[in-house]
Amino acid sequence: MYATFLLAVGALALCSGRVQANPQLMSEVDTQAATEVSYANFQQWLRDFRQYAAGQGISEATLNKALDGVRYRERVIELDGYQPEFVRPIWEYLDTAVSSTRITNGQEKLADHRNTAQQMEQRYGVPAEIIVAIWGIESNYGSNFGDFSTLESLATLAYDGRRRDFARGELLAALRIIDQGDIAAEDMKGSWAGAMGHTQFIPSSFEAYAVDGDGDGRRDIWDSIPDVMASTANYLDRAGWQSGQPWGVEVRLPEGFDYAQTERRSSAEWRNQGVQAQQGELPNFDSAAIVIPAGANGPAFLVGANFRAILRYNNATSYALAVATLGDAIAGREGIQHSWPRDQAPLTRDDVQELQRALNRVGYSVGGADGVMGPNTRQGLRNFQRDQGLIPDGFATQELLEQLRQRSQ
């Protein structure tokens, strides 16, 4: 009715000889019309998906409970398309992720649930402080795991998101979880992206790794701390966690160290190159890599299989380092000793895209200019640095960007 009224206003304007339409009114008409079309298309998509899910064995009762009333969520699409202007430096991320408050709260949570955490440590070989650290990073110990309907988020993303096939598969997995009785449809809550519960499992990860830790017959990562801890420990165990080994250690690198080395070596081989632990001795790793997340001017770490297991949970070096160092802090161990290069101005996403285009132009192929400092971009940057007689650490700075600008003109 509102749209009809607006169209009538436009018709009266034309009759009176005023041919310029009101932009605000026309914008409201366009927006409402687009919303109505999108809603109708979404409902048709949902009906089609419902038939598909039924063909995959989801019961009619579950489909009724889970999909009746599911709505398209514009906010989910807004968040899916959000790209921050600046590439956040790792030290700023760690300042928040491993804050003194989070450390204290983690120690309190470990004290509150020590028996459960130790049981899971004995069962899976994953230290209690690492289990609690993932809990802290993922949802701030359960205080913020999201209040989005997982079903609505995934349905919206499957219909209109950037990774539609992926979201469609996760939506089907969510329906299977409900069908199996682990959680009621209305209680399946989490992030806008479909990650669920205290430690933010996506539905397919829930199916693969969730564990009934309290023996009540359900895998409940929303309300059962034993299930949360068992599921998290099981995930890391299945990802290759090696019991009795540390995640890694902060190290000192010798003068003249070749920062371009990306391959794994044994601790003995690294030791022969002059790599030393900041404190004590190097752990006995069979296969370990040097990680320098802020380049040659920042801290360096020798990381082994357990660091790689954390990366399986979230494939970002900053995330894995946050979990590892938060776990250390919860257990009372010292934190990172070397200072971060906080005087380095962060690059914007546009800066990174410009850097990628410049590398491509001067012969260091890094693929598309997506504004993300991925492995191809870092390798291309290392090659450029080496050819320029610079330390090939692959760390992008404003100074390097300016050099590339000049070279690529």
Region locations from a protein language model:
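Extracytoplasmic and endomembrane cell-envelope/extracellular-matrix remodeling and assembly machinery
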Residues: A33-V70, I77-P84, I103, L157-G194, ...
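Short, conserved phosphate-binding/catalytic loop or strand-edge motifs used
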Residues: I137, F148-A155
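Active-site-adjacent structural elements in enzyme catalytic domains
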Residues: K109-S139
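Bacterial N-terminal signal peptides
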Residues: T4-C15
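Signal peptide-directed extracytoplasmic domains
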Residues: V70-H113, Q119
